[in-house]
């Protein structure tokens, strides 16, 4: 069902403790006091702890009627003069398409809430693809993304929108997403790249497209096949023009998540980029912007 048809029919990983993550003077951002930094960090950790607790609940405990469901808005757009439609990533229901009636009206309780990267609790009704959003509450404020980290966050959102089907829960995806946002916040360029590569690898694995060596283990170099797996390339082999290969050491580091060496990080970017492109019908918009900035 297309989005327009839906609208017509509608009318993990554990999180560290606060003590382990408390920032010291070296982590202080310009213009921020130690007390202010600690308050922001503790608020963020409280949100992440709540998400972690809820994520640990068995899937069988998922309520039939969603209420106060932890969620992040991936994308929202106007639907009419007074309403919005939005895609949200939720903890237990996966990616959900929501109609927020009257959300643009000055007196609406939803006004200003449906923005990316803000942790929310959402309540909705409906059995069709387009659900009716009835309530939204802020869970709290996470440290904001800005600059190139913000663009990286939009890239993460676009990956989820393009690779994840609506209402497919994908256990572990919500925690993976939250971890990516946390890792992008305040990170230097090199750490942002590592965070993006980890998210790409985790997302491909959750979708059943994990990049792995399927043939030619121990070969000196590897190539990515159109099936999304890596195959060994014998020394002296002649390949078609444009086929990219990577040394065994780099491939081993990438698959093991060892991205400290610049060569391994570069190989991870190239391998996961190609693996994702195999699953897309058209290029990613945010990747094009980030590529112009030479960070993706």
What role is predicted for each listed range?
Residues 2-21, 25-85, 89-296:
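Non-catalytic alpha-helical scaffolds and adjoining flexible linkers that form interface surfaces
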């Amino acid at each position: 069902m297309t989005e327009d048809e839906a609208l017509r029919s509608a009318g993990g990983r554990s999180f560290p403790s606060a003590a382990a993550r408390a920032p010291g003077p070296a982590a202080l951002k310009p213009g921020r006091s130690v007390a202010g930094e600690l308050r922001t960090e503790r608020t963020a950790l409280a949100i992440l702890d709540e998400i972690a607790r809820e994520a640990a609940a068995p899937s069988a405990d998922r309520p039939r009627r969603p209420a106060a469901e932890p969620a992040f808005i991936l994308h929202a757009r106007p639907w009419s003069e007074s309403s919005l439609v939005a895609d949200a990533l939720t903890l237990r229901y996966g990616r959900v398409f929501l109609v927020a009636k009257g959300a643009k009206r000055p007196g609406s309780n939803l006004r200003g809430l449906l923005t990316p990267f803000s942790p929310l609790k959402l309540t909705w009704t409906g059995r069709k693809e387009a659900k009716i959003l009835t309530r939204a509450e802020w869970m709290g404020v996470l440290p904001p993304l800005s600059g190139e980290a913000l663009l990286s966050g939009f890239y993460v959102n676009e990956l989820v929108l393009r690779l994840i089907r609506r209402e497919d829960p994908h256990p572990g995806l919500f925690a993976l997403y939250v971890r990516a946002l946390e890792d992008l916040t305040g990170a230097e360029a090199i750490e942002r790249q590592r965070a993006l590569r980890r998210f790409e690898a985790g997302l491909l694995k959750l979708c059943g497209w994990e990049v792995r060596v399927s043939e030619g283990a121990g070969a000196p170099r590897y190539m990515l096949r159109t099936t999304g797996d890596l195959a060994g390339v014998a020394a002296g082999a002649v390949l078609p023009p444009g086929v990219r290969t990577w040394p065994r050491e780099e491939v081993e580091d990438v698959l093991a998540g060892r991205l400290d060496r610049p060569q391994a990080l570069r190989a991870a970017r190239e391998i996961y980029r190609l693996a994702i492109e195999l699953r897309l019908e058209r290029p990613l918009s945010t990747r094009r912007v980030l590529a112009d900035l030479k960070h993706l």
